[in-house]
C-alpha cells in the first residue's frame, strides 16, 4: 500500500521526517457530544497518554491542543472542529474534536461525516443530554461505528449506572459497557448482593 504521506521539517539544521502510515493504519475518530461534556479534556488525555504531548493541557488554563483560537480560550468551549493526531501501537489516530454548542452544529455534522467512527462523550454529572442524543443520531444516520465514553465519573453526584440505564433507553438496548470505572465496581457488587 502507498504511504499516506511524508512531511519533513528542518530543526536546528537537522531534517526530521514524520512517520509514514499506510491507509490501513490510519483511523479518523470524531469526538462528539454536548457542550462541556469533556470532549476536549478527553482529547488532551489521549494525546498525553500516547506521548503526542508532554503535558496535559487544561481548558481553564487556555493551553489545550484543540482549543487554540482566542475565542475558544476566552469562552472555554470549542467553537470549531480541530484535528489532534497521535500514534497508538503503530496506528495513526486522527481525533476530530467537534464543538458541542448548537450554534456550531455544522462542525459536528462535518466531523462525523469525515470520520469512520464516533466517540460520543456523555458527562457523568449531566447524563445523556440533547447534544449527546443528536451526536448519537448523526452517527447512526451516517452509518458510523459508535462508542460512548462517560466522562467526569470521579466528580461528586456522578452516577455511572444511572447514566448507563439512561443510555439504554435513549440510544437503544444494544448499549453495553466495555469498561466500568474502578470507583464503581464495588458499588455494583454491593447493589447486586442487596437485591438478592
Q: What are these model-predicted stretches?
A:
Residues 179-181:
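P-loop NTPase motor core
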Residues 46, 114, 134-138, 142, ...:
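Short alpha-helical scaffold segments that flank and stabilize functional sites
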Residues 124-174:
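Conserved C-terminal guanine-recognition region of P-loop GTPase G domains, centered on the G4
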Residues 185-192:
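Conserved small/polar residues in nucleotide/adenosyl-binding loops
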Residues 13, 194-196:
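N-terminal cationic leader/targeting segments used for protein routing and processing
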Residues 17-122, 126-128, 162, 171, ...:
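P-loop NTPase switch module centered on the Walker A-proximal segment
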Residues 3-17:
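Short, Lys/Arg-enriched N-terminal segments with co-localized hydrophobic residues
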Amino acid at each position: 500500500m502507498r504511504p499516506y504521506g511524508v512531511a519533513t521539517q528542518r530543526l536546528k539544521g537537522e531534517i526530521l521526517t514524520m512517520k509514514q502510515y499506510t491507509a490501513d493504519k490510519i483511523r479518523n475518530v470524531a469526538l462528539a457530544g454536548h457542550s462541556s461534556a469533556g470532549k476536549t479534556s478527553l482529547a488532551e488525555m489521549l494525546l498525553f497518554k500516547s506521548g503526542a504531548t508532554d503535558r496535559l493541557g487544561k481548558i481553564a488554563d487556555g493551553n489545550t491542543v484543540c482549543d487554540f483560537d482566542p475565542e475558544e480560550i476566552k469562552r472555554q468551549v470549542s467553537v470549531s472542529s480541530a484535528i489532534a493526531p497521535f500514534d497508538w501501537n503503530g496506528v495513526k489516530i486522527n481525533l476530530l474534536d467537534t464543538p458541542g454548542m448548537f450554534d456550531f452544529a455544522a462542525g459536528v455534522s462535518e466531523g462525523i461525516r469525515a470520520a469512520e467512527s464516533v466517540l460520543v462523550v456523555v458527562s457523568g454529572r449531566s447524563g445523556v443530554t440533547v447534544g449527546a442524543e443528536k451526536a448519537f443520531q448523526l452517527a447512526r444516520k451516517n452509518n458510523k461505528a459508535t462508542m460512548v465514553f462517560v466522562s467526569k465519573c470521579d466528580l461528586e453526584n456522578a452516577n455511572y449506572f444511572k447514566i448507563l440505564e439512561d443510555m439504554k433507553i435513549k440510544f437503544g438496548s444494544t448499549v453495553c459497557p466495555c469498561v466500568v470505572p474502578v470507583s464503581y465496581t464495588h458499588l455494583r457488587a454491593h447493589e447486586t448482593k442487596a437485591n438478592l
